[in-house]
From Swiss-Prot:
GO BP, sorted A to Z: L-methionine salvage from methylthioadenosine; purine ribonucleoside salvage
GO CC annotations, alphabetized: cytosol; nucleus
Protein name, as recorded: Purine nucleoside phosphorylase
Reactions the enzyme catalyzes: a purine D-ribonucleoside + phosphate = a purine nucleobase + alpha-D-ribose 1-phosphate
Organism (species): Drosophila pseudoobscura pseudoobscura
Quaternary state and interactors: Homotrimer.
Record-stated family: Belongs to the PNP/MTAP phosphorylase family. MTAP subfamily.
CDD domains in UniProt: MTAP_SsMTAPII_like_MTIP
Cross-referenced InterPro entries: MTAP, Nucleoside_phosphorylase_d, Nucleoside_phosphorylase_sf
Localization: Cytoplasm; Nucleus
Amino acid sequence: MENNLAPINEDPFPIKIGIIGDADLDTTISLQDRMEYAVCTPFGKPSDIIIEGLIDGVKCALLCRNGRLHDIMPTNINYRANIWAMRKLGCTHILVTHSLSSLREDIMPGDFVVPNDLIDHTTRRAQTFYDGALGSPFGVCHLPMYPAFCERTRQHLLNAAQELDLATHSKATVLTLEGPRYSTLAENNIYRKWGADLLSMTLSPEATLAKEAGILYASIGLVTNIECWCANQPIATTHEIIYVFKNKVEKLQQVLSKAIANISKEDWSEDILKAKILVCSNFANRNK
């Protein structure tokens, strides 16, 4: 008789999955035993309260990146507090969603993307926990950013989207803008030459900080519009972009739920340990 049983998670590091996304996820993700917490961190307050609960029996923590009223612009998001709060609550993984703008003809509005690399083009955001400020961790961490995401976690998001038969791109490079404005035609042509496939305003430094915190991090993005790189291309309005996102947000929730269920069945002890060792092994401390 063929054994179709999935491996059971028996690892000594019980998993807990953080979810960071846009305001609409707060109303579409169903959490059992829902509890709300105001978490304090050395870096200030997170974007909003954190909602803890169970998704199919898996411990999860949900945070709205821009606030539940979507009233925090990308530059002013306290990325360090958001990630530190997830770490403080014991999250081993963070799954995130992003709205993305396409720089490629074959990546269309309504498509889903599971990026495998990033370009940080922001200029005004705190990039590290280890900045020497009062209350921050001691030392300087020179963290390698290849790969930019946890590949195993990334594959779970990709598999979940494909199992739901969603139009999904398995690899892409996302460039993060400072925002809140969109980029010019000239800027978009530069970004395309750099190898960027999509634009975000919130992926960086979130991904870097999650890695610095020793958390397994991966993203799934929804393409909401095509950016202009030719003079005759139409330009989407913010209302049109929001409309595309709202029409697909339930699909994002389904991807997350399926990925969470599959992640919870596996042993992650080695991956969790490696993520923590990576951080510890990349300090520059001359007093050792």
